[in-house]
C-alpha cells in the first residue's frame, strides 16, 4: 500500500538550472535532464536575456510556465525527413519496484506549428538511453494522453498514463516513440516550412506510486 505520494522525478519542474538560455538546444542548462539521441531540446526560462528563449513569448510561440519560471520544448514530429526528433531524459530518485503501479503525468502545450499529435510517450529503462545515433527512437512506450488531440496552444494540458514496473527501472525518457503517427492538422494556411511540425512545451513531470489505476487523476 502506498502511504504517501512521492514524485520520483528530479527537477520535475525544470527550475533548477546552471544558467539562463541564450540560444536553441541548451537543454543541458536544466539540471538532471539530457538528450538520449542526436536531438537538441530547447530550454526556456523567464531569466533569458533574449526574447527568443523566454517563456510567455519566444521562438516557438511561447507560453507562461505551468509553474515556476522555466520549461522544456521538444520537436516531436516533422515533415522534413532530414530532421531529427527530440527527447528529454532523466534519472529517477530511486529505481522502480517490481509490479508496483506508477502514475506518470506531465503538462504539455503545443507551440506554433501546423500539426499536433494524439499522445506523447514515456519509456522507463534500467540504463540510460544515450548517444543513440538515430533521428527517431522507436521503442515500446507508455502512452500519455487525455483522450483528445494535443492541440491546445493557449493553455497547459495534463496528460497521463499508468505504468506497471518490471523492477529496477532508473531512467525516464519522454517524447514521440510511435513508428507511424497520426497527425492532426491545426493550421491550413501557413506556407512557412518551419511550421510543418509538432512541437511541444513540457512542464511539471511526475512519477508517483499508486495502489490502483483509478488513483492516477488528471491535475489542474
For every predicted segment, state its role:
Residues 127-130:
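Short loop/turn segments immediately following beta-strands, especially the blade-tip
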Residues 1-5:
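Hydrophobic h-region of N-terminal signal peptides that target proteins for export
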Residues 6-98, 107-108, 115-120, 132-219:
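Aromatic (Trp/Tyr/Phe) and Gly/Pro-enriched flexible surface segments
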Amino acid at each position: 500500500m502506498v502511504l504517501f505520494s512521492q514524485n520520483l522525478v528530479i527537477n520535475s519542474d525544470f527550475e533548477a538550472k546552471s544558467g539562463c538560455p541564450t540560444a536553441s538546444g541548451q537543454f543541458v542548462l536544466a539540471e538532471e535532464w539530457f538528450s538520449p539521441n542526436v536531438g537538441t531540446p530547447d530550454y526556456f526560462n523567464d531569466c533569458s536575456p533574449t526574447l527568443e528563449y523566454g517563456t510567455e513569448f519566444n521562438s516557438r510561440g511561447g507560453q507562461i510556465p505551468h509553474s515556476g519560471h522555466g520549461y522544456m520544448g521538444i520537436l516531436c514530429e516533422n515533415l522534413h525527413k532530414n530532421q531529427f526528433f527530440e527527447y528529454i531524459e532523466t534519472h529517477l530518485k530511486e529505481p522502480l519496484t517490481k509490479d508496483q503501479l506508477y502514475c506518470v503525468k506531465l503538462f504539455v502545450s503545443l507551440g506554433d506549428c501546423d500539426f499536433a499529435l494524439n499522445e506523447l510517450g514515456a519509456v522507463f529503462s534500467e540504463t540510460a538511453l544515450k548517444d543513440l545515433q538515430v533521428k527517431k527512437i522507436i521503442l515500446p512506450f507508455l502512452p500519455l494522453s487525455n483522450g483528445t488531440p494535443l492541440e491546445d496552444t493557449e493553455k497547459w494540458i495534463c496528460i497521463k498514463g499508468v505504468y506497471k514496473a518490471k523492477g529496477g527501472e532508473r531512467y525516464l525518457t519522454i517524447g514521440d516513440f510511435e513508428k507511424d503517427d497520426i497527425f492532426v492538422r491545426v493550421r491550413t494556411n501557413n506556407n512557412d516550412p518551419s511550421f510543418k511540425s509538432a512541437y511541444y512545451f513540457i512542464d511539471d513531470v511526475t512519477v508517483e506510486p499508486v495502489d490502483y489505476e483509478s488513483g492516477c487523476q488528471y491535475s489542474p
